[in-house]
């Protein structure tokens, strides 16, 4: 109710979009619905109302929203369900800042009205690149500080071959200073931190402890004579635990140590459940490289606009292109994602081509959208906060199953009615389907 009241006051129209739609590639697998009337053809349940809300903007609707049910056939986890609800919003003639302002004010209003929480008057912003560099994730939990630092310079001043090899290969050495925790971390507890790093492909976790100006344990012997220099550059002091990940791949070093940071936050009780720490992550890459298929994939989806400064060089180096993309993060969870959309049909065709759709395939899959653009699409953008995940965090839970009536379990099964279930042969025959063993 609070969401509807807020958006309606801003002249948003609540419009329902279809539930049976055309199957289009949007990232996750579609849930498919076979057609009885058209053998061999299928509807899909919407992963989001993305294309319909863009067509609404073309149709002259200035501001739209709906409380949308969405369906994605993907692996389950604690903060994810195969069916979920999002607050879907779209606006014409807006910039990124306009969308962010409307969204921030909505969260401030809703949190105050529902749970009496006063949120910050302005949510901080960080670029995707800085989020990876400082926190090792694009979903940083900023309820505690503990930022990662660059320590590639240690390859020069120490004798540790792991650091030297990583830097020589063009990689990185990342460091964390855990203040005052040297005495509390035994070798066994450090091995638990190392296990967290190895999940993200780190080869190991280097460490040492600061004690009386000297280093003890771990890589201490490789740092002899330069302890003071290291402590000064890392702002470390007596009683601190120093942790390092080195890797030939910069992102691996960052994400692996970022996982260690996240575990430390939990282990050291740094995650105050009564604090709501919102953060905007902006300037995402528009594309990401798919190693398995050797092609570029959209980082979010194919309808997000590149930043204007990249328009002339899109095809030359897709990996360098930043999109007009933004995510809202709350306490380490992504709670909303959005972008300024492409409204030029020729630019949309260029994006299709970069991600591997030839003109015929693009026309078959998305011709209805590019045809609509020909009638004059306004610049537009939007965002879609995930309602279930937001309620989970407001309630202090760690699984959205705790705030959903009749949730699916981690195997995507409904314990209440035991769906999915078998159907009889007559139903299958009516749908022109047969089950292969």
What residues fall within each predicted segment?
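Class II aminoacyl-tRNA synthetase catalytic cores and aaRS-like
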Residues: 1-437
């Amino acid at each position: 109710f609070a969401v509807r009241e807020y958006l309606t006051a801003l002249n948003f129209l609540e419009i329902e979009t279809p539930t049976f739609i055309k199957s289009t590639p949007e990232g996750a697998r579609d849930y498919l619905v076979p057609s009885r009337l058209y053998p061999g053809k299928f509807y899909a349940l919407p992963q989001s109302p993305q294309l319909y809300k863009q067509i609404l903007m073309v149709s002259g609707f200035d501001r739209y929203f709906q409380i949308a049910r969405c369906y994605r056939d993907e692996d389950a986890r604690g903060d994810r369900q195969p069916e979920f609800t999002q607050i879907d919003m779209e606006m014409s003639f807006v910039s990124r800042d306009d969308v962010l302002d409307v969204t921030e004010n909505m969260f401030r209003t809703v949190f105050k009205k529902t749970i009496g929480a006063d949120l910050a008057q302005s949510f901080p912003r960080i670029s995707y690149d800085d989020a990876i560099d400082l926190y090792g994730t694009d979903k940083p939990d900023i309820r505690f500080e503990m930022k990662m630092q660059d320590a590639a310079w240690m390859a020069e001043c120490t004798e540790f071959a792991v650091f030297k090899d990583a830097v020589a290969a063009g990689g990185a050495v990342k460091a964390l200073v855990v203040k005052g925790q040297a005495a509390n971390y035994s070798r066994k507890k450090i091995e638990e931190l190392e296990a967290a790093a190895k999940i993200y492909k780190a080869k190991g976790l280097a460490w040492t402890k600061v004690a009386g100006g000297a280093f003890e344990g771990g890589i201490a012997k490789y740092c002899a004579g330069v302890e003071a220099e290291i402590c000064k550059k890392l702002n470390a002091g007596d009683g601190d635990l120093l942790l390092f990940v080195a890797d030939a791949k910069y992102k691996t070093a960052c994400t692996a140590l970022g996982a260690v940071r996240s575990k430390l936050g939990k282990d050291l009780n740094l995650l105050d459940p009564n604090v709501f720490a919102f953060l905007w992550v902006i300037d995402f890459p528009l594309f990401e490289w798919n190693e398995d298929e050797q092609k570029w994939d959209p980082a979010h989806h194919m309808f997000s606009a590149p930043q204007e400064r990249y328009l002339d060089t899109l095809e030359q180096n897709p990996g360098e292109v930043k999109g007009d993309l933004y995510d809202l993060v709350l306490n380490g969870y992504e709670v909303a994602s959005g972008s300024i959309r492409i409204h030029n049909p020729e630019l949309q065709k260029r994006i299709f081509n970069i991600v591997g759709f030839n003109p015929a395939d693009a026309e078959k899959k998305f011709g209805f959208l590019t045809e609509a653009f020909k009638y004059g699409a306004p610049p537009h953008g939007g965002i879609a906060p995930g309602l279930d995940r937001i309620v989970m965090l407001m309630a202090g839970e760690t699984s959205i199953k705790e705030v959903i009536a009749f949730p699916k379990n981690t195997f995507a099964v409904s314990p209440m009615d035991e769906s999915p279930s078998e159907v009889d042969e007559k139903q299958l025959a009516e749908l022109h389907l047969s089950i292969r063993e």
